[in-house]
């Protein structure tokens, strides 16, 4: 996801899914 940061804005769905996974991971650690 970070590697495709330039296209992240053009792929909102993929970004949302990525953030959901990342959010869950961070929530688990927090």
Swiss-Prot record:
Where exactly are the transmembrane stretches of this chain? none
| Primary location group | plastid
Q: Which GO terms describe its cellular component?
A: chloroplast; chloroplast thylakoid membrane; photosystem II
The subcellular localization recorded is:
Plastid, Chloroplast thylakoid membrane
One GO BP annotation of this record: photosynthesis
Can you tell which superkingdom this protein's organism belongs to?
Eukaryota
UniProt keywords, alphabetically: Chloroplast, Membrane, Photosynthesis, Photosystem II, Plastid, Thylakoid
Q: What does this protein do?
A: May be involved in the regulation of photosystem II.
Q: Indicate the family of this protein.
A: Belongs to the PsbP family.
Q: What is this protein called?
A: Oxygen-evolving enhancer protein 2
The protein's organism comes out as: Euglena gracilis
């Amino acid at each position: 996801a970070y590697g495709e940061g330039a296209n992240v804005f053009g792929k909102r769905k993929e970004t949302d899914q990525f953030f959901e996974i990342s959010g869950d991971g961070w929530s688990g650690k927090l």
